[in-house]
Swiss-Prot record:
Domain MsrB: 7-129
This protein's name: Peptide methionine sulfoxide reductase MsrB
Organism in which the protein naturally occurs: Salmonella typhimurium (strain LT2 / SGSC1412 / ATCC 700720)
InterPro entries on file: Met_Sox_Rdtase_MsrB, Met_Sox_Rdtase_MsrB_dom, Mss4-like_sf
Gene3D superfamilies membership: Peptide methionine sulfoxide reductase
Tagged with keyword Ribonucleoprotein: no
Uppermost EC category: oxidoreductase
Chloroplast is among the record's keywords: no
Keywords: Metal-binding, Oxidoreductase, Zinc
EC number: 1.8.4.12
A Pfam cross-reference name: SelR
Active site: C118
Binding annotation for Zn(2+): C46, C49, C95, C98
SUPFAM superfamilies: Mss4-like
């Protein structure tokens, strides 16, 4: 993993919610994320280290309250960890570069993968394909 900024540096760089989600494995409230309804073409990056994670063409409305994707940009982009917290068995997803918490992946997504990457907006930054504008979750 890449060198990650210290917790003190990240607290200065990130909002309270962004720090909670990416560093403390938190979850933003459903239907509140800034990137949930984003429909522009572009790439979703890790908010902490700017690693590309998902293309907009793999985003879909799952109705779960968080941005959902059916496939990451590459296998290396995401790190998978078994998560047995809160009395559930899930698979946590983290940035493959800096280890920031992103959300979870579930086996109930659309084809072609059948997977739903349920991602906190607060862990993402979006780069617009047409004009290069950046939007942070």
């Amino acid at each position: 993993m890449a060198n990650q900024p210290s917790a003190e540096e990240l607290k200065k760089k990130l909002s309270e919610m962004q720090f909670y989600v990416t560093q403390d494995r938190g979850t933003e409230p459903p239907f509140t994320g800034r990137l949930l309804h984003n429909k522009r073409d572009g790439v979703y990056h890790c908010l902490v280290c700017d690693t590309p994670l998902f293309h907009s063409h793999t985003k879909y409305d799952s109705g779960c309250g968080w941005p959902s994707f059916y496939q990451p940009v590459s296998e290396e982009a995401i790190r998978y960890i078994d998560d047995f917290s809160h009395g559930m068995q899930r698979v946590e997803i983290r940035c493959g570069n800096c280890d920031a918490h992103l959300g979870h992946v579930f086996p109930d997504g659309p084809q072609p993968t059948g997977e739903r990457y349920c991602v906190n907006s607060a862990s993402l930054a979006f780069s617009d394909e047409k004009n290069g504008d950046q939007l942070k979750g």
